[in-house]
Structures are given as structure tokens and as C-alpha cells.
């Protein structure tokens, strides 16, 4: 069965990252468990590389752009991220859930998934993981978590 990096990340997030009740096992234990769960060593390594890239983003300086700056997507990004996904990212930025640095990190992490098709659910999960990893984003994380799991928010265009 072909698994994706994204499925490994979802497994880790649901079972360990978002669970504050239990201490997190070490990386070797996680790799063994993921292998036993049916993920390939290559996918496991790529998922940990993805998480390392997310963790490394905490040390990157934020770039400042003007208030009226418009994000223009590169051709590779428009191929991978459909109009609905890009529109949702814009909505999150306009709603104050993502700032510019958060938006760029979400786009970076979506591109790092190496999946050809990035759908709206994938975008929502990646936004949730990015917000979870960013200090001071608890309220935005809770909002995204409600949106992802409860789906109470109706977007009006």
C-alpha cells in the first residue's frame, strides 16, 4: 500500500504531537512504530525531514513587507495548489489566522510534501500543524482545530 508523507504526518499529529497528556516517545521508537503501522522507511524519513524543516522555521527571521503587498504565486505553486487552496490561504490571512510569515511557512510546508495534488483538507491540516508549532498562536490553532474537526464555520464569499 502506497502511503504518503502527509499520511505519516497525520498519524504522528493525531497520536503524539497534539496529545499533551503523555510524554512523547523518542525518534527511534516513533520510527519503529511507524514501520510497524505500515509506513515505508523512506516515507518515515521524509516525514521527519518535513517536521525538522517546520521546527527549523522557528529560527528564521521574519521578512517584512508592506501592508498592501500582494502574494504572487510561482508557477510551481499554482500547479500544486489549486485556486480553492490558494483562496483559503488568503482567507486565513485576511481573517488574521495567518500572518505573512505564517502564510509563507504554510506554502513552504505544502510544497515540501512532494504530493502532486494538494487539496483543501491537506491545506487545513498543514495550517493546523504550522500553528501548533508557532508560539503564541494558541487561539488561531484552536480556531483551525474547530474548523478541521467540527466544521462549524461557513465561509461567505
From Swiss-Prot:
Protein known as: Protein Smg homolog
InterPro entries hit by this protein: Smg
Entry similarity comment: Belongs to the Smg family.
Domain of life: Bacteria
PANTHER family reported in the protein's UniProt record: PROTEIN SMG
Coiled coil: none
Signal peptide start-end: none
Amino acid at each position: 500500500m502506497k502511503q504518503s508523507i502527509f499520511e505519516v504526518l497525520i498519524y504522528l499529529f493525531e497520536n503524539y504531537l497534539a496529545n499533551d497528556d503523555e510524554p512523547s516517545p523518542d525518534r527511534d521508537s516513533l520510527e519503529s512504530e511507524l514501520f510497524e503501522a505500515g509506513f515505508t522507511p523512506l516515507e518515515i524519513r521524509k516525514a521527519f525531514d518535513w517536521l525538522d524543516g517546520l521546527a527549523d522555521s522557528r529560527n528564521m527571521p521574519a521578512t517584512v513587507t508592506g501592508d498592501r503587498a500582494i502574494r504572487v504565486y510561482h508557477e510551481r505553486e499554482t500547479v500544486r495548489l489549486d485556486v480553492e487552496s490558494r483562496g483559503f490561504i488568503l482567507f486565513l490571512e485576511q481573517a488574521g489566522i495567518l500572518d505573512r510569515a505564517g502564510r509563507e511557512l504554510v506554502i513552504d510546508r505544502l510544497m515540501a510534501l512532494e504530493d502532486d495534488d494538494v487539496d483543501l483538507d491537506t491545506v487545513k491540516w498543514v495550517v493546523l500543524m504550522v500553528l501548533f508549532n508557532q508560539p503564541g498562536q494558541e487561539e488561531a490553532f484552536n480556531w483551525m482545530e474547530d474548523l478541521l474537526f467540527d466544521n462549524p464555520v461557513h465561509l461567505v464569499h
